[in-house]
Every structure is written in C-alpha cells, then in structure tokens.
Amino acid sequence: MTVHDRIEINSKVMLGKPVIRGTRIPVELIVRKMGEGADEKALLQAYPTLTPQDIHAALRYVADSLGHEEVVLSVAE
C-alpha cells in the first residue's frame, strides 16, 4: 500500500483536507500532535483506528507536499 492509498482528499470529508482514508482524522492533526511532542505510541492510543503505517503515510504526504512547493524568500534591504 502506498502513501496515496492511505491518504484521501474528499470535499465531503473535513472540508476537503487530506485525511487518513476511511477516517475523519486529518493529516494536519497527526503532524501537529507530533510537532507538539506526541510520539507514535501516544497517537495510536488517542486514535485507536490509526495504524503505524497511517502515521508514516501522513508524514510522507507532508514531506512530499513540501518537496513540491515553491518557496519565495524576500531579500532584506
């Protein structure tokens, strides 16, 4: 199963935000919680429908999204 098999974007689910397929758990929530210090074990306990593979897919999805994003930096004068 690939990242894209686990991540779903549907305008009728969470206003079209990327979620773990078959859930209403946004990718953003997973990444935000991890950024706040939650580890995989804590996420799996808090969201029993998640699997370790779902968490890894969410992280890869964000990395892929950022990898294809253009960043424009302004030069300080």
Predicted region positions:
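Short, charged, surface-exposed hinge/linker loops at domain edges
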Residues: 53-77
